[in-house]
């Protein structure tokens, strides 16, 4: 049946079912960043409590990323096979349990194990969430939808430094993790109760919503796929995007993970001041993400050019951050760098959402995000080693982040952007 011609259209609803789905996904993403990024503020105190040097502290970050990266592709495969709803709900509940367990750890080996399993739970989630966004949103809205979802990349770290600094100051670092494990159980229940893998099965979906999806969804929003994994791997753009995301995320995770420590140890900010100053750049980043998402939908042909341009500008302001003598000006330059860096990030995901068919989005985005999380595995210990080998100076760490961001722009120049059909046909 052709939905576009066979279904009578009623008056469009102001609040659509896909907005509820996006809200739940946004809350889950916010919690995922909050749960992982409080470690950035807690790390100096964990290091002091457990007698760890900066290299060992970097290993704690890497333990999470190893588990997180390891389950990017399996998480996408599971989402394509069993549907996003089940994988998201299980993943959120899993990582929430291990968030609370982090607060009970008293030794480095056990900390590494707990953070690894925490990473596994979070690793199942991204691909499933992107698959659901691509299933529920027509192509004309995906840039803005992913930009809204991506605001957590900035709001999460910003909120994390405020929450962590407040709780650590009052109760110590253990309590931060114990408390933050609780909300995820409620969000997991919300995902299970108020989302469906196939939009047609959602109780709040309207005929108008289905018509909008039918206009560019050849499978009508099918939530599952039996496309062979080897066929997914044959897409050249997939590997180019994974490479770009790997290079970008080395800078992103270095910026996000080490910023609080940099302000405390180099700029000599107090814990309270760090809680405020470390949050401000991420608020600018949220603005950059939303602006980038809007421009991504409005300026599709210029996406590649805009990614390259804003990445180069962000790299320039990163250089000014560590080279300026004024601590307050360093924060200003961090804010400008974050604005352009996250604008570029929105461009990246707009390109991916529009070039990858929705019925293989789970596996495809898992492959791309695997590249990004391998960057997280590498970024934290390498930056920790650079700091330690430079007698506490962060200059070489900043140069490393600048170089990888510029390399991501260079690789982007090689990408041939093309708009694919929204789905690949399932095998009989």
Which stretches of residues belong to each language-model region?
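C-terminal transmembrane helical hairpin of 12-TM major facilitator-type secondary transporters
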Residues: 302-348
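Helix-breaking motifs and short loop linkers at transmembrane-helix boundaries and internal kinks
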Residues: 51, 83, 104-110, 121, ...
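Cytoplasmic membrane-interface "Motif A"-like loop-to-helix N-cap segments
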Residues: 81-92, 297-311
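A late C-terminal transmembrane helix in Major Facilitator Superfamily
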Residues: 353-391
